[in-house]
């Protein structure tokens, strides 16, 4: 009987420690779920939900556009095409999306620019009634097509992954799906891939087997240019499947490309080499002149000398839509983003002014 109090005390301590551990685990799970929900809220386009444009859907092609007789034609993709991909169900492209495609079409007048949209893959013969599609019809080198994921991934290591991924919930599925699409497109067709938050300043056709450097530690696949069936892209597809992790942001995208490039070049640091075995990683200024941490610079005024420097040293500007979306842009201001729209997607820029 005298030992009862000490036993009870030990039992109480054990129970309390288990409760504290359980509370800690519960708090961790709640925080994880909250961060995932916050991510999805951030990545939604606030302007894409029910936005109504005042302009009529029929757009007059007022600006000079590429000549149709110099444009690649044919029913299927061909080597050298420029690709954009929309992996969500959205079929109401916003201003930045439209500027991306328009700037690519203008800088590549003799090249087919293919816009693949998952939301169109439902058997409809006609495009949705939207000003963006009317504007794209002004460019004879632009083709809007449904994104058939089963067909795209067929015959690649990504086919089995895609079927399995559809049967489970993943926090970053859409970005990962986009990562998969770009390497599948590069493997099957080759050509140029661009994210829909790029503004293209120059023709990219002289770049082959090239990707861009985001920072001194990481490469980025928002721009890719490769010949079809390239061994580097094949290794990317294998790494995608063998080292798959859907819970780490960027693991299947920038980090994947960085891993594969280091193995490809047999290096431990990106500073050791920027080109080897026929594959090149261009310096940050070529495609990512403004770091994602400095995204607010797009909304700040720039001098003519700064703009001239950018035009001379950069192929295309990545706007980091995940950060910039929802931020109000004074379209007639001297802000960098407004000037980029004015110079490289004037038709989209005019519509932005009329709707501002």
Predicted feature residues:
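Short aromatic/hydrophobic "clamp" motif used to bind/position activated sugar donors
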Residues: 191-193
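Glycosyltransferase-associated regions of secretory-pathway enzymes
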Residues: 2-178, 196-356
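Small-residue hinge/turn detector
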Residues: 179-189
């Amino acid at each position: 009987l005298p030992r009862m109090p000490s036993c009870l005390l030990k039992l109480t301590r054990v129970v309390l420690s288990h409760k504290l551990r359980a509370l800690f685990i519960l708090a961790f799970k709640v925080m994880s779920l909250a961060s995932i929900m916050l991510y999805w809220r951030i990545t939604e386009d606030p302007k894409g939900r029910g936005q109504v444009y005042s302009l009529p859907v029929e757009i007059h092609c007022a600006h000079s556009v590429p000549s149709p007789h110099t444009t690649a034609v044919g029913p299927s993709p061909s080597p050298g095409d420029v690709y954009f991909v929309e992996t969500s169900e959205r079929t109401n492209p916003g201003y930045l999306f439209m500027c991306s495609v328009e700037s690519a079409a203008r800088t590549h007048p003799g090249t087919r620019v293919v816009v693949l949209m998952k939301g169109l893959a439902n058997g409809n013969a006609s495009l949705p009634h939207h000003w963006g599609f009317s504007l794209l019809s002004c460019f004879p080198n632009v083709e809007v097509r449904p994104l058939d994921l089963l067909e795209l991934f067929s015959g690649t290591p990504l086919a089995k992954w895609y079927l399995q991924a559809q049967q489970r919930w993943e926090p970053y599925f859409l970005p990962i799906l986009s990562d998969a699409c770009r390497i599948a497109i590069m493997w099957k067709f080759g050509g140029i891939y661009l994210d829909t938050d790029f503004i293209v300043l120059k023709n990219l056709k002289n770049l082959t087997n090239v990707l861009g450097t985001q920072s001194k530690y990481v490469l980025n696949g928002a721009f890719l240019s490769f010949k079809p069936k390239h061994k580097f892209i094949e290794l990317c597809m294998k790494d995608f499947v063998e080292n798959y992790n859907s819970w780490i942001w960027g693991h299947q995208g920038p980090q994947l490309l960085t891993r594969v490039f280091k193995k490809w070049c047999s290096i431990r640091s990106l500073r050791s080499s920027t080109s080897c075995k026929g594959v090149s990683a261009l310096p940050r200024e070529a495609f990512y002149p403004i770091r994602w941490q400095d995204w607010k610079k797009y909304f700040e005024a720039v001098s003519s000398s700064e703009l001239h420097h950018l035009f001379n040293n950069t192929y295309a500007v990545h706007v980091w839509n995940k950060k910039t979306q929802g931020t109000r842009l004074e379209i007639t201001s001297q802000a960098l983003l407004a000037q980029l729209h004015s110079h490289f997607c004037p038709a989209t820029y005019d519509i932005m002014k009329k709707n501002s």
